[in-house]
Amino acid sequence: MSVHGRVAPGQVAGTARQRSEPGTGTWRSRVLGTVLAYLALTKPRVIELLLVTAIPAMLLADRGAVHPLIIANTLIGGMMAAAGANTLNCVADADIDKVMNRTARRPLARAAVPTRSALIFGLALTVISFFWLWLSANLLSGLLALATVAFYVFIYTLLLKRRTSQNVVWGGAAGCMPVMIGWSAVTGTLAWPALAMFAIIFFWTPPHTWALAMRYKDDYKEAGVPMLPAVATERQVTKQILIYTWLTVLATLALTPAAGWLYAAVAAVAGAWFLTMAHQLYAGVRAGEAVKPLRLFLQSNNYLALVFCALAVDSAIGLPTLLG
């Protein structure tokens, strides 16, 4: 303040800066919070499955000779489709997400994003992914992506999830589609190796999901979702986990004629390791011991990544296939 009762120019600027800085910080925090909320709707961790399985499928389709631009465009389109499906799944499951401890922090469960905005966001991602794949790859891959979203939202989320304990068995087919999309983006068709990769993920999904659901079975009971561990005994669940683990390993071995020796060796060794864990879980339950199903859940991720990474390396370096 000057001696004449006036505010000095420097003081005005300083005061303005002091008033604007908190507002700027708050505005930035709100924007960042909104961006992170929309990102969380897409379930980025789930999208990792796309990267782990789609790239090896594309490399196998052309024995490593596929153009990098095709890979990039397919991954972008595939990730948008997966993000759209996951967002729409969050919209449909908002009511049960509020009840379950594991999902209570999801954006719609805590009202961080308006439901209508999330719905528009999910639909927009789905439509854009279809046209992206159609224009950058081919119509078949775009249609497969569109069918995947529709199946995941309407068949799994709205029809199966709340009605049957076999929900993840049949609903898990949506998670198998990245290999089909990747293969079709490169070749424009579908062939038996793509179906074999589909089978690997199809059979892998139940033991992977049920192992996690065993840990959170009380959540599913509270939400009224008939996930197998919530409606069956631990012995019944672990027996089913063991059966599907065997089917998973057999499916990986069925793919060996189209792959090279590296994949065959890794599939055999990793399969033995995966089976050992499943047998240990089942044996522990039968013996009445305290078991740790979450360990199988976490290691099942490593198993799938290891098998498909071996397939990618095998295809990229062009090792001779077992078919010659």
Curated annotation (Swiss-Prot):
It is found in: Cell membrane. InterPro entries: Protohaem_IX_farnesylTrfase, UbiA_prenyltransferase, UbiA_sf. One of its GO terms (cellular component) is plasma membrane. It is an enzyme of class 2 (transferase). Residues 1-25 are annotated as: Disordered. Its EC number is 2.5.1.141. Pfam families: UbiA. Keywords: Cell membrane, Heme biosynthesis, Membrane, Transferase, Transmembrane, Transmembrane helix. Gene3D superfamilies: UbiA prenyltransferase. The keyword Iron-sulfur does not apply. GO terms for molecular function: protoheme IX farnesyltransferase activity. The keyword Signal does not apply. It is a multi-pass membrane protein. GO terms for biological process: heme O biosynthetic process. The chain crosses the membrane at residues 65-85, 117-137, 139-159, 164-184, 185-205, 237-257, 258-278, 304-324. Carbon 2 of the heme B porphyrin ring is defined according to the Fischer nomenclature. Converts heme B (protoheme IX) to heme O by substitution of the vinyl group on carbon 2 of heme B porphyrin ring with a hydroxyethyl farnesyl side group. Belongs to the UbiA prenyltransferase family. Protoheme IX farnesyltransferase subfamily. This is Protoheme IX farnesyltransferase. It comes from Mycobacterium ulcerans (strain Agy99).
